[in-house]
């Protein structure tokens, strides 16, 4: 009886022989049980793309100092911001292009291209000998870093409907952990000849290039992921007509017959129409806008936290070494992983993605207000309060972003997910381009107003971060943020 049911189900779905997307759909229909293998693949690929994004922040302060471009100590944050934003500028310029390519040629080729580019350009960044080489290699790394948008589409296609929240949670968890573990690696492995002289001599490669070891480590991991990606299935369908509803079949068939004629030029027109329909899809566009605002906060916070922790106490910082910053971020990564695996799916099921985003954003505000006061502590109390605040901020930030990823993928069909996520990546990258540059300039400015009457020093920095969060939370209310009925 069960076999007859399966056959009837497969026949009803009208799968196509030789279509990789149909093979995945068949697998989803017939498979029972938790998708551990697929979840592992998604998790490790997204982790590989997020590791290099923030890995430079713990040592960027010292890297800029070594380049000798900053005239004074207070100018270091200014130059650090431009190195940080070059990655996002590159990604902003290419995200839509990679999304369209993924919709046309498949997810798997784009995933392979992305992991290979990480291995190459991140290693070259570690070998940077001057300010402009650092900016150039980070720009190229961002230009070819096309994985996040593609992986969001891929994750929504490889899992059954009941695991969609888990899929998006896996994407955002791996992304968030990569943004934490990456800086932790940067903190522990930068300047190895100074920290571990028994292992690395000053005359060795890592003694001459003080920041190459964390970059090479991440590149080696990306190479390993590239090999694993050869075994993942393609999810894009290579047929179009049979999956459409009978109500639309006549119109689409007529359009297809016109497209087959070279004289009509309908194909390009239809593609432009599809692109325009995405821009008019308000559930998609509203969720992308909120997503961009919260991502702006996320990237600005990441850079400011590292600069603030590294900066001297006389400027309101913590005077932390790269190792100490790495320890805080590693602990935050553990807390984030535990929360996203065990708590977030339950929270999303209970509250829904909109409320999760709203509540998470609101809770970040009082925690960020406490950071300048935490800097006044010392010893065990400083470590305890700083680690608790860092864990909470990272957990809440990733939870808010996860809810928006779910809303974005619910707002479009499969044929548009690559392009939709490309639009989201472009918009987000533009905001994240502003984030590091703005954060560096803001931080440098705050160190010049330590005795100001209104929000002196780091108080101003964290106040601006809270303003961004308040805007993001306000946009989660109707009529601005609407959800799709798909």
UniProtKB/Swiss-Prot annotation:
Description of what induces expression: Up-regulated by zinc and manganese. Not induced by cadmium, copper or iron. Down-regulated upon nematode infection.
One of the Pfam families matching this protein, by short name: MFS_1
Compartments in which it is found: Vacuole membrane
Membrane topology: Multi-pass membrane protein
Molecular function GO labels: transmembrane transporter activity
Gene Ontology cellular-component terms listed: plant-type vacuole membrane
Entry's transmembrane regions: 41-61, 82-102, 109-129, 131-151, 170-190, 212-232, 288-308, 327-347, 362-384, 391-408, 423-443, 461-481
GO biological process: response to nematode; response to zinc ion
InterPro entries in UniProt: MFS (IPR011701), MFS_dom (IPR020846), MFS_trans_sf (IPR036259), Tet-R_TetA/multi-R_MdtG-like (IPR001958)
Tissue expression: Strongly expressed in developing leaves, differentiating zones of root tips and sepals of developing flowers. Restricted to vascular tissues in older leaves, mature roots, flowers, anthers and filaments. Not expressed in developing anthers.
Consequences of knocking out this gene: Zinc sensitivity resulting in increased chlorosis and decreased shoot fresh weight and root length. Accumulation of high levels of zinc in shoots.
Superkingdom, natural source: Eukaryota
Keywords: Membrane, Transmembrane, Transmembrane helix, Transport, Vacuole
Main location, first listed in the record: membrane
Further details from the record: Overexpression of ZIF1 confers increased zinc tolerance and causes interveinal leaf chlorosis.
Family: Belongs to the major facilitator superfamily.
Function: Major facilitator superfamily (MFS) transporter involved in zinc tolerance by participating in vacuolar sequestration of zinc.
Name of the protein described by the UniProt record: Protein ZINC INDUCED FACILITATOR 1
Source organism per UniProt: Arabidopsis thaliana (Mouse-ear cress)
Species lineage: Eukaryota, Viridiplantae, Streptophyta, Embryophyta, Tracheophyta
